[in-house]
Amino acid sequence: MAAAAAAGAASGLPGPVAQGLKEALVDTLTGILSPVQEVRAAAEEQIKVLEVTEEFGVHLAELTVDPQGALAIRQLASVILKQYVETHWCAQSEKFRPPETTERAKIVIRELLPNGLRESISKVRSSVAYAVSAIAHWDWPEAWPQLFNLLMEMLVSGDLNAVHGAMRVLTEFTREVTDTQMPLVAPVILPEMYKIFTMAEVYGIRTRSRAVEIFTTCAHMICNMEELEKGAAKVLIFPVVQQFTEAFVQALQMPDGPTSDSGFKMEVLKAVTALVKNFPKHMVSSMQQILPIVWNTLTESAAFYVRTEVNYTEEVEDPVDSDGEVLGFENLVFSIFEFVHALLENSKFKSTVKKALPELIYYIILYMQITEEQIKVWTANPQQFVEDEDDDTFSYTVRIAAQDLLLAVATDFQNESAVALATAATRHLQEAEQTKASGTEHWWKIHEACMLALGSVKSIITDSVKNGRIHFDMHGFLTNVILADLNLSASPFLLGRALWAASRFTVAMSPELIQQFLQATVSGLHETQPPSVRISAVRAIWGYCDQLKVSESTHVLQPFLPSILDGLIHLAAQFSSEVLNLVMETLCIVCTVDPEFTASVENKICPFTIAIFLKYSNDPVVASLAQDIFKELSQIEACQGPMQMRLIPTLVSIMQAPADKIPAGLCATAIDILTTVVRNTKPPLSQLLICQAFPAVAQCTLHTDDNATMQNGGECLRAYVSVTLEQVAQWHDEQGHNGLWYVMQVVSQLLDPRTSEFTAAFVGRLVSTLISKAGRELGENLDQILRAILSKMQQAETLSVMQSLIMVFAHLVHTQLEPLLEFLCSLPGPTGKPALEFVMAEWTSRQHLFYGQYEGKVSSVALCKLLQHGINADDKRLQDIRVKGEEIYSMDEGIRTRSKSAKNPERWTNIPLLVKILKLIINELSNVMEANAARQATPAEWNQDDSNDMWEDQEEEEEEEEDGLAGQLLSDILATSKYEEDYYEDDEEDDPDALKDPLYQIDLQAYLTDFLCQFAQQPCYIMFSCHLNDNERRVLQTIGI
């Protein structure tokens, strides 16, 4: 207490008042701990009142470090103090809430807190460490220069609590360290961490692990700094890399015991991986030592893992870290795999993996086995089995990590991996025979893992067998292993895997063998089978439908379809969530196998799908799977009539129901399903769709206040306009309003300034479709729409909404350029200047952020047309506009820290609009070239073993390569993905209107190259070229300008 009293005196706070506040605080903290809800709630309100007083933080610090205080109060005070520092210490913090802690209070708190780092209660110690670290982030070194000396004294004090406290501070601090602090931190911390790490007789395992973690964090941070400041690594980390690496090599060789365990080795491996990833050149010389040792760790760990986890024939105690976290042995395995991934990512080390493939894959398969724990969980919970074994699972286990590694090596070395996998699997299967003969019950797990491994990368196996690159007895594997295992009762999980594996290899089967496997699969669906077998049978059916469609031999499936359908529907009735999703997905592909069969059972499939959709209306995954099934049924002409008779009245009644009578979100989903039906039905549409569904969706959209319903309603009307504008225009209500009038009403509502901006996220697509389909019939209405878009643009803040609105003008540039310019010049924008200036300023400041391949093409080609028109027609309306060019950085600014950004607001150059457009076109070309290059860089190109001659390359070469990215802004890096095909999986390229637009087919790289080459020939080009920066000139050089 003496320290606290002295600190209180130092702060000059008047005694009784301070005491009164402190007592109030203790009462309030006691209240927060009360079991009575009312007392608790009152105390939580009271703490908010106290939080804004000057002494609040000081009193929390005093209570936290008071050894005589009640433990519960001290713990709570330390947690609240941690939050207080985050929100009040510095006005530049992202979490800041006023008032800012006063200087006087800060001095006292900094004085008090380090005492809490010696605390014997670890929870208090950890909270104090967190608070100290958060303060240091803002105050060190300027306002708290002595902190590091204090921490270093604690590290050598011999007091275990103080060591742990100081290490906690350093761990937290280094995670958040800024690039301006790192040059002061690294030279002090890294040598100390080295000492702690290597002094095994002085420091405990967990403290030494933390020292390695701190080293790893610093290594990553310094590597990031190196991208912006060349030479940072040379000064900050290279001096210690060698000694650390040698110590790491020693540490990995230590047998487990008092000075080493799996948690410790995991941290060491993470550090080695960080060095290999970040500083490969420096690691080349140490690799000869490191590789054999990591390899030993991999192989020894495999045997240990199989004993303790897979078969559970041996019990072990997992180590626990200093915060009470259990460090499971699997964490060491993960870090070994991460190390191998790091080798694969670097051309210097890739060949080392290639050489070890046969052995590596042999061990990967060992790690892929099912563990006893998984068998227990999956047997008790079939939903978990589906989730864990799904391709897109969020679970992370050794089995999944091993699969990931197998897929990574198979992608990088296709031919070599096929050979290695065939060899490894053959060896495992032979060993399994011996294990089985010796009466061991776990022999089947290796069979299961081999089937999983071969099935996961089936195409490289089947291709290699076909081309004679590998000698693998495919027929023997299918009959003597997979088929034979189906007749054994070793484990339901082996049966299930065998069903799945067979479905992966139909290309290698005779029709008779396929028949046998299909028969087994249908039996596997039966209710008497264990859930894991039934679930695997569903997966296998999906595989057969998929494979047999590709090889155009679905006739083999036809006799089994009735039993498959019944089996799926029975299974869906018994399970929900994950299992149900799998069944629905499979049912959807079954619908596509034989349209005649599907039409004959529409009366089963459709009522079932409607029932599931209504029962699970709040589950978006089920809804979207139901939608997929309705889509398939819509495309089969014989199903359309009966399906619509069943489905449309259901959807209409949902749309007409009062909002409080149906589950939230159901109406929006029903509209989405209607959209799918309209899009996938050939016109003319039925009376049901035009006279009942259309008015229902229009009315529903106009009278809802739910954003999702409005958005989906707009998209649904767009489908109607796109598929059958004539029918929409011909339909009339009793008042004489036609369908087009309703569409206009909906557009006005989506653009209404009073509705949320998110309702406008897709309105651009609706308007563009409307203009392209009904352009001439819109007349006055078009002006009205464009005015509404302009006023919505003045409110919009989100990129997606702004892009949607700007795209309407981009489309009009293609079809009605002159009328558009005239219209925009006849209206004032927000500043009183013509609206054209407002639209172009908004567009050009966001073009580089637009996303979506189709949108990228529409807007880029529109910009070319505008530039061409501005020059050819000598159009002063465009030539006289000036817009924001590039951001101005002052040379003496150095790194832009948070405080600097706050003091110096952004400044921009001001350039002519047409110059800005040229710059944007060049930027689009650069992005699309990059995306195309990335797409063409197939694995084959990386396969060339180029690692041997690269070891000696000169420093300069590598530095030049790295320059490219450093100068890019995040927005540029994000924008480059606009044209990458796999960036958007489903969303917009499924948009039928986009696919029908000839612009979508354009080769943008060729178009922009051609445009720029022609533009550079024009006399005015000289005036433009003086505005281009070095990057832009470089891009033009690549196309010969």
Curated annotation (Swiss-Prot):
Its main location: cytoplasm. The modification N-acetylalanine is found at residue 2. InterPro entries: ARM-like, ARM-type_fold, HEAT_IPO9_central, Importin-beta_N. It is found in: Cytoplasm; Nucleus. GO terms for molecular function: histone binding; histone chaperone activity; nuclear import signal receptor activity; small GTPase binding. Keywords: Acetylation, Chaperone, Cytoplasm, Nucleus, Protein transport, Transport. One of its GO terms (biological process) is protein import into nucleus. It comes from the Eukaryota. Residues 943-964 have a biased composition (Acidic residues). One of its GO terms (cellular component) is cytoplasm. Residues 43-119 form the Importin N-terminal domain. PROSITE patterns: IMPORTIN_B_NT. Residues 936-967 are annotated as: Disordered. Belongs to the importin beta family. Nuclear transport receptor that mediates nuclear import of proteins, such as histones, proteasome and actin. Serves as receptor for nuclear localization signals (NLS) in cargo substrates. Is thought to mediate docking of the importin/substrate complex to the nuclear pore complex (NPC) through binding to nucleoporin and the complex is subsequently translocated through the pore by an energy requiring, Ran-dependent mechanism. This is Importin-9. It comes from Mus musculus (Mouse). The lineage of its organism: Eukaryota, Metazoa, Chordata, Craniata, Vertebrata.
